[in-house]
């Protein structure tokens, strides 16, 4: 876990960046970003590796920032030029436009993150067969009827493992009134939630308690709204102690409600302890490490993915040090590093198997916790 946590800690540093649009990218050949430039890197190209953001900015302290950090780290280590490109709007056309701009700037590889890129990747991979496309948190299903081609590598994560660790840790640490706030009921969010429930139930069994309650709700979207804020205010005021907030900006609503009511929150995807004071831990993905490993695979093979990644969806989890809890920044009072290490090792060696189902209508079986699934 040390290598994974190193990436998490490095990526948590805030980046002060200007948004970029059109064909003028922000440029970097190191781990800090400079102003846009037309100066070529040592490779002779203005852009070697491009990162196309989602509609958020590059300093979002979430997927964009951590994925970009991975691109920067890789390019810095290999004397390559990294640039990011921000779509002007939330549409497939805008995403494709920035991919076009990256190719025109000489990109050999284009990195994206998030299921919204499914359709644009499906089109771009055929349009640019010599460009390598690395898509994090994008599954084969997100590409619709189009299969990933040899120049496309899809990476998804075993969110259920990270969710399980978070739920187990929370109950072991003494929390009895828990909540799960999901955004849209997409597979990744569902796996986080179901893992959380399974982990909480496992800890309750070990402790021999049956008084653990979990409120569970999908907001239906990832935007911060008054509806979500009011819902979270209600939960905390009714006695909920900690909520696993899983859904991008909805975390802002959860944090505001937690602050107002003296509650706590569990972050998601990246270590959010530096963003929200209410966070006791975060269920994280090794975004930067994933980027580095996959791009190194392509670079070492003449800028072509090997069979390890080419034309397939690779699912990463604890065995690859790509999901977990950032224990160095966690605020547990009872749950220990030793307990975490033992649980993590059990997941890695297969002695602990976590259900990875993601049917929103089929809930995980539990024995020692009571789950209130709300609509």
Model-derived regions, located:
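Positively charged n-region of N-terminal signal peptides that target proteins for export
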Residues: 1-8
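Bacterial signal peptide processing site
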Residues: 21-23
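A residue-level marker of the well-folded mature domains of exported/periplasmic proteins
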Residues: 27-375
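Repetitive helical segments and hydrophobic/amphipathic motifs
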Residues: 11-12
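Extreme N-terminal leader/targeting regions
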Residues: 7, 25-26
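C-terminal motif of bacterial Sec signal peptides marking the signal peptidase cleavage site
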Residues: 16-19
């Amino acid at each position: 876990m040390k290598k994974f946590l190193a990436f998490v800690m490095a990526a948590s540093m805030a980046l002060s960046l200007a948004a970029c649009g059109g064909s003028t990218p922000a440029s970097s050949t190191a781990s800090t970003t400079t102003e846009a430039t037309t100066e070529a890197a040592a490779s002779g190209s203005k852009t070697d590796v491009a990162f196309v953001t989602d509609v958020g900015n590059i300093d979002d302290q979430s997927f964009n920032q951590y994925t970009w950090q991975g691109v920067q780290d890789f390019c810095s280590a290999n004397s390559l030029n990294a640039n990011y490109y921000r779509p002007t709007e939330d549409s497939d056309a805008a995403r494709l436009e920035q991919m076009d701009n990256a190719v025109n700037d000489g990109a050999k590889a284009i990195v994206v993150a998030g299921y919204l890129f499914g359709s644009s990747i499906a089109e771009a991979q055929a349009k640019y067969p010599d460009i390598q496309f690395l898509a994090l948190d994008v599954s084969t299903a997100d590409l619709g009827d189009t299969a990933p081609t040899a120049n496309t590598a899809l990476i998804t994560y075993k969110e259920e493992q990270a969710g399980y660790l978070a739920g187990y840790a929370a109950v072991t640490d003494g929390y009895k009134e828990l909540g799960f706030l999901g955004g849209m009921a997409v597979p990744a969010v569902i796996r986080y939630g179901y893992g959380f429930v399974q982990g909480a139930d496992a800890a309750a069994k070990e402790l021999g308690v049956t008084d653990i309650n979990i409120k569970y709700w999908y907001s239906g979207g990832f935007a911060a709204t008054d509806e979500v804020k009011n819902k979270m205010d209600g939960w905390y005021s009714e006695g909920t102690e900690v909520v696993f907030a899983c859904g991008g900006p909805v975390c802002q609503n959860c944090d505001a409600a937690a602050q107002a009511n003296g509650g706590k929150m569990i972050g998601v995807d990246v270590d959010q302890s530096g963003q929200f004071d209410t966070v006791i831990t975060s269920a994280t993905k090794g975004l930067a490490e994933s980027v580095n490993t996959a791009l190194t695979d392509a670079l070492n093979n003449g800028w072509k993915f090997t069979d390890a990644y080419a034309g397939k969806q690779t699912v990463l989890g604890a065995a690859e040090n790509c999901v977990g809890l950032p224990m160095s920044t966690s605020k547990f009072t009872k749950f220990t590093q030793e307990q975490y290490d033992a649980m993590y090792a059990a997941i890695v060696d297969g002695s602990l198997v976590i259900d990875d189902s993601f049917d929103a209508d089929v809930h995980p079986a539990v024995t020692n916790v009571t789950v209130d699934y709300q609509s």
